Structure formats: C-alpha cells, structure tokens
Swiss-Prot record:
It catalyses: ATP + H2O = ADP + phosphate + H(+). It is found in: Cytoplasm, Cytoskeleton. GO terms for cellular component: cytoplasm; cytoskeleton. This is Actin-1. It is an enzyme of class 3 (hydrolase). The modification N-acetylaspartate is found at residue 3. It holds the Pfam family Actin. The keyword Glycoprotein does not apply. The gene is ACT1. SUPFAM superfamilies: Actin-like ATPase domain (SSF53067). It comes from the Eukaryota. Actins are highly conserved proteins that are involved in various types of cell motility and are ubiquitously expressed in all eukaryotic cells. The lineage of its organism: Eukaryota, Metazoa, Spiralia, Lophotrochozoa, Annelida.
Length: 376
C-alpha cells in the first residue's frame, strides 16, 4: 500500500450503468450497461466460437439473440453470479488491470442489507484476491464530489431514488428515504404514453430507443398545468425524432408528462410521495438544528436528475413547503450523472483515507463482517 505507483480502482455499480476507472482521474474510463446476456438458443451462431454469456455493450449489441438480465435491481445486487461476471468484465476487459494488484473502492445503495455488503467483500477478497477494498455509500460520494460534507442528496438513477441527509460526512440512516421510482420506470411510462399516440414499442431492443428519446427530448415543466395548456393550444413544444429504421415520430406533451411522474407518482399508479415531498420529509426527520444546512445544500445526483428544468422545479416545490424565511439552494452540478464515481475517485486518492482500507490481512483475520466495522 505504501507504493505510490499503485492506483486504487473505483467501481460504481448502478442498476443501469456500471462506472469504473482509476482514483485521481476526473471521470470514469469505462461506462457500460450493467447487463449480462445469455444466448436464447444454444448453438445459433455456428462457428462464431459462441460464449455462454456476454456483458455490457457486447450484450447490448447482440441483444436480438440474447436474454438480457440486470443483476442489480433497485440499487441492490440480486444475482451474485452475474455480478461476478460484471466485475470480471470491468477489471479484465474494460480497465485491463489485475485486480490482485490494486485496492478497490466499491459503492453501495443506502440501506443496503448487511449480508449484501459482506458478500461483496467476500467476492473481492476470495474471487479477485484484492489487496484491499472499501465499500462507500453512493449518496455520500456525490456530496463529496460537490465539495461538501453536510447536505441532503437526492440520488436518482436507473433503478432507485434515495434522499440521504448527511452531516459532517456521515449519512443519517434514520432519515434516509427510498423511492422505488427511477429511470427505468420513466422509460416504461414513456413507452406506454407513446403507445397511446399510436407508436408501438414493446421489445427490450425498442425499450432502448425509448430510453434515448427520454434522454434527448424530455424535460421537467415548471408549471405542469400551464405547460399542458401550451401544448394543447400550439405546436411549439413538439419535437421530432428519427427512429433507427428512418421513420420519424413526433412527440409533444409526452416530453414533460414522462418526467412529471417524478413529482406525481400517481401517474404511474404509485401511492408514494414525489421527489420534492420525499426530500422535504427526509429533512423533517432530521434534528431541527441541522435542517437549515440541509435546505441550503440540496444536491442532485444520478442520471435521472439530468432532465432540463428539474432544479428550478425542485426549488419552487421545496420553497412552497419549507418555512417562508428559509434559504433554499438546489445544487445540480453538470457532471451529476457521474457524481458518485467522481466522489469515489476523490475519496480513494485522499492521503487521510489510506488507513481506512480493509486489507486482505484484516479480512483473513476477521472474515466478511469486518466490513461493518470499517465502512460506515
């Protein structure tokens, strides 16, 4: 560990995308879908030296003949064999490093079950022979990336949304709230409302097209009802999108109706509070003395917070719920898609962090439960 040449690896395993790279870099080297695909029929591709599984972009490009599975659901690993394949792919194919030579910083969802983080630790030391590892909470890393140690993070990715209040670098578990509504649900909802317009999207391959439409054309309205009125009375909000086969489709109020479900989950038939209320409820679960710091440092992170207009809408909604004299500031850094990874890169390269790693020796002495004592 004393060697200067040994760079730590930072791997942020999201439900939708895996971000990986080297500590000290300002962006991840590899970003690929967290999917493992297996051939639907054995021996379809004659003479192609068919593999029994494909990971990431390769699985994505061959999706026509594969069954795709996401090993991470709602931010939590549910299939460890596939997860191992993703890590193997990360180290050997994407980063091209020997995992036994580098410490690894992994990320986990807030409120991750204890058994999950033990299993992660076990796989790193026993399967990949890591010299050292650490597990950090995703939202805390996003806050570090914004240069803060106190604030509340609204982290919304592909599989899950969390609001995590953090004080002096420590997450406050009693006030963390989780919302099972994220990017994947928005894509599904957009597929549904485009079908109502007469465009049919059903297969997993077509779902990727809809995800692209969502990322390129959707935005959050500041005033939903007013925007609906504008969309009904003029075509100024309409945009066209060219499908891979050359057909051009027009999309109107769907552009803001889709992300509106983040604020009104009833659109998806869910009874939960929207992201603005969830953030507010999370702040209200904290000690009254730190609320002021949380309102003034509300940080957005994750790909699902990338919609244009989301920060202004959030500002408006929280201002209407908070005490009238409260200063409210929503921080939405442009690189928030990768904030978690960037925070990990910062953390793993701090000199003060070097004594925090769990070493192979400590693991051999204590077993997987060491992770609860050293990572909190």
């Amino acid at each position: 560990m004393c060697d200067e040449e040994v760079t730590a690896l930072v791997v942020d395993n999201g439900s939708g995308m895996c971000k990986a790279g080297f500590a000290g870099d300002d962006a991840p080297r590899a970003v690929f879908p967290s999917i493992v695909g297996r051939p639907r029929h054995q021996g379809v591709m004659v003479g192609m030296g068919q593999k029994d599984s494909y990971v990431g972009d390769e699985a994505q490009s061959k999706r026509g003949i594969l069954t795709l599975k996401y090993p991470i659901e709602h931010g939590i690993v549910t299939n460890w064999d596939d997860m191992e394949k993703i890590w193997h792919h990360t180290f050997y194919n994407e980063l091209r490093v020997a995992p036994e030579e580098h410490p690894v910083l992994l990320t986990e969802a807030p409120l991750n079950p204890k058994a999950n983080r033990e299993k992660m630790t076990q796989i790193m030391f026993e399967t990949f022979n890591s010299p050292a590892m650490y597990v950090a909470i995703q939202a805390v890393l996003s806050l570090y990336a914004s240069g803060r140690t106190t604030g509340i993070v609204l982290d919304s990715g592909d599989g899950v949304t969390h609001t995590v209040p953090i004080y002096e670098g420590y997450a406050l578990p009693h006030a963390i709230l989780r919302l099972d509504l994220a990017g994947r649900d928005l894509t599904d909802y957009l597929m549904k409302i485009l079908t109502e317009r007469g465009y049919s999207f059903t297969t997993t391959a077509e779902r990727e097209i809809v995800r692209d439409i969502k990322e390129k054309l959707c935005y959050v309205a500041l005033d939903f009802d007013q925007e609906m009125g504008t969309a009904a009375s003029s075509s100024s909000l309409e945009k066209s999108y060219e499908l891979p086969d050359g057909q051009v489709i027009t999309i109107g109020n769907e552009r803001f109706r889709c992300p509106e479900s983040m604020f009104q989950p009833a659109f998806l038939g869910m009874e939960s509070a929207g992201i603005h209320e969830t953030t507010f409820n999370s702040i209200m679960k904290c000690d009254v003395d730190i609320r002021k710091d949380l309102y003034a440092n509300t940080v957005m992170s994750g790909g699902t917070t990338m919609f244009p207009g989301i920060a202004d809408r959030m500002q408006k909604e929280i201002t209407s719920m908070a005490p009238s004299t409260m200063k409210i500031k929503i921080i939405a850094p442009p690189e928030r898609k990768y904030s978690v990874w960037i925070g990990g890169s910062i953390l793993a390269s701090l000199s003060t962090f070097q004594q925090m790693w769990i070493s192979k020796q400590e693991y051999d002495e204590s077993g997987p439960s060491i992770v609860h004592r050293k990572c909190f």
